[in-house]
Amino acid sequence: MAGAGSLMNDVRFLGGHGTSRIEGGRDNPYNNTHTADPDLARRWDGQYPSLWVTDGGGGTFFDIWTPGTFAQSGMLVSNTATEGRIYQMSSEHHVRYEVQLHNVSNWRIYALQTEEERGEGGFALPLEIDSSSNITVANFHIYRVISVFQPFPYAVKVSNSKDIRFRNIHCYSNSKVSFDGTIYDQAHDALMRQREFAWLDLSGAAPAAPPKRDSVVLADGAN
């Protein structure tokens, strides 16, 4: 079991973009329409998450590159309250999810980068946090390549969670379609639309309602 004091350092998960062949050449990840692998037997989104920490696992994960399009996500953390830390992970080129936290407490994520490609990542969610608490996400860089033509409603989805802290979030794409918003709180149907911000705390409580103001046009005595 990977406990709080364990370490994974400098790991590149095989598969997907950037994979070299045995003879040294580049492995082409696309068919001629960018809709699948050239070998149809190598199905996108058909494997378990590349890195799965579960059932009380934890520890430090440093300098990880997980770009395998064949996996359901780059990293899944589930069912653990053991302390965990992620430093400088790049999770890229997945079909559905880049990083997922399910029923997790006491984890900190620093300098995470996610990236979606046009062919496989049009509907990919960079970060999902579900039924979790006491989570810190800091210096998070969320990116989509310029050729993406499929918009997506949000970059981070938080549901049934509390004490979630975001620090220094950068959500960027130089394509015409990107994310409509950055963070979506599903429990309260609240969307954070700002792409660059220094901090945001989600306590789990409903957001404060804005004060009601009389309309300038309909106020008594208006001309």
Predicted regions span which residues?
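Extracellular/periplasmic carbohydrate-active domains that bind, remodel
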Residues: 1-223
